[in-house]
Amino acid sequence: FPPWE
């Protein structure tokens, strides 16, 4: 759930 995924 990272901002880039």
Swiss-Prot record:
**Which residues are modified to Glutamic acid 1-amide?**
5
One GO CC annotation: extracellular region
Q: Which UniProt keywords apply?
A: Amidation, Amphibian defense peptide, Secreted
* Cell compartment(s), UniProt: Secreted
**What GO terms in the biological process aspect are recorded for it?**
defense response
- Source domain of life: Eukaryota
User: How would you summarize where this protein is expressed among tissues?
Assistant: Expressed by the skin glands.
Question: Into which family does the record put it?
Answer: Belongs to the frog skin active peptide (FSAP) family. Tryptophillin subfamily.
Query: What is this protein called in UniProt?
Result: Tryptophyllin-T2-2
Species this chain originates from: Pithecopus azureus (Orange-legged monkey tree frog)
